[in-house]
């Protein structure tokens, strides 16, 4: 049984992170930016799992930390979407360009 090399995991994580970074920097829709940030967090989680599984001293620390990070990311996404819904009700848009003032 052959295992996947560590370089494949790291390459996939780099590709996912770059796609998320590109989307977060270029898109103007706040929902898409939030999804791209979640994609970058998942790329970091993939690195944690890959290093904990394929490192010099394999242990479960990276995998447990990855689960903790996923729980925090889920809470962050829920709070972010709640803020976006409130902003949409206030301003009827979710574009980043129109959210530059703090006026209510």
Curated annotation (Swiss-Prot):
Membrane topology category: Multi-pass membrane protein
Keyword RNA-binding tagged: no
Keyword Ribosomal protein: no
Catalytic activity entry: a quinone + NADH + 5 H(+)(in) = a quinol + NAD(+) + 4 H(+)(out)
Transmembrane segments: 4-24, 31-51, 67-87
Gene Ontology biological process terms from the UniProt entry: ATP synthesis coupled electron transport
Broadest EC class assigned to this enzyme: translocase
InterPro entries the record matches: NADH_UbQ_OxRdtase_chain4L/K (IPR001133), NUOK/Mnh_C1-like (IPR039428)
Xref: Gene3D superfamilies: 1.10.287.3510
Localization annotation: Cell membrane
Principal subcellular localisation of the protein: membrane
Keywords: Cell membrane, Membrane, NAD, Quinone, Translocase, Transmembrane, Transmembrane helix, Transport
Gene Ontology cellular-component terms listed: NADH dehydrogenase complex; plasma membrane
MF GO annotations: NADH:ubiquinone reductase (non-electrogenic) activity; quinone binding
Domain of life: Bacteria
Pfam families tied to this protein: Oxidored_q2 (PF00420)
Quaternary data: NDH-1 is composed of 14 different subunits. Subunits NuoA, H, J, K, L, M, N constitute the membrane sector of the complex.
Function: NDH-1 shuttles electrons from NADH, via FMN and iron-sulfur (Fe-S) centers, to quinones in the respiratory chain. The immediate electron acceptor for the enzyme in this species is believed to be a menaquinone. Couples the redox reaction to proton translocation (for every two electrons transferred, four hydrogen ions are translocated across the cytoplasmic membrane), and thus conserves the redox energy in a proton gradient.
Listed NCBIfam families: PRK05715.1-2, PRK05715.1-3, PRK05715.1-4, PRK05715.1-5
Protein family (similarity comment): Belongs to the complex I subunit 4L family.
Protein name: NADH-quinone oxidoreductase subunit K
Classification lineage: Bacteria, Bacillati, Bacillota, Bacilli, Bacillales
């Amino acid at each position: 049984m052959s295992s996947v090399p560590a370089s494949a995991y790291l390459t996939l994580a780099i590709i996912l992170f770059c796609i998320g970074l590109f989307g977060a920097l270029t898109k103007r829709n706040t929902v898409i930016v939030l999804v791209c940030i979640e994609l970058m967090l998942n790329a970091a989680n993939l690195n944690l799992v890959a290093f904990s599984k394929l490192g010099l001293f394999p242990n479960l620390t990276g995998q447990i930390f990855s689960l903790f990070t996923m729980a925090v990311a889920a809470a962050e996404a829920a709070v972010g979407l709640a803020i976006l819904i409130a902003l949409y009700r206030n301003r009827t848009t979710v574009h980043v360009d129109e959210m530059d003032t703090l006026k209510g």
